[in-house]
């Protein structure tokens, strides 16, 4: 179930303060964050936010189409290496 509209979007305070500070200065430096749960708000458009995936920080450039989604959606946590192709020669027995 989605979040109630009367509550508004959830964004961690420390992340929002960093974005607003960069907007006030007019800079667009990469912002490192562990806050995968924060929702993307219009103030973040044009910024690059490095979202932690459990191992490293994945840079995510924020566009208008991403508004309303959470940061964690754009930094996958699992690495799929593909299924191993079955080799007929190795199955002979």
Curated annotation (Swiss-Prot):
InterPro entries: Ribosomal_uS19, Ribosomal_uS19_bac-type, Ribosomal_uS19_CS, Ribosomal_uS19_SF
GO annotation, biological process: ribosomal small subunit assembly; translation
Tagged with keyword Transmembrane: no
GO MF assignments: rRNA binding; structural constituent of ribosome
Keywords, ordered alphabetically: Ribonucleoprotein, Ribosomal protein, RNA-binding, rRNA-binding
Entry keyword annotation includes Ribonucleoprotein: yes
GO CC term, one of those recorded: small ribosomal subunit
NCBIfam families attached to this UniProt entry: rpsS_bact
Family: Belongs to the universal ribosomal protein uS19 family.
Name of the molecule in the record: Small ribosomal subunit protein uS19
Organism of origin: Acidothermus cellulolyticus (strain ATCC 43068 / DSM 8971 / 11B)
Gene that this polypeptide is encoded by: rpsS
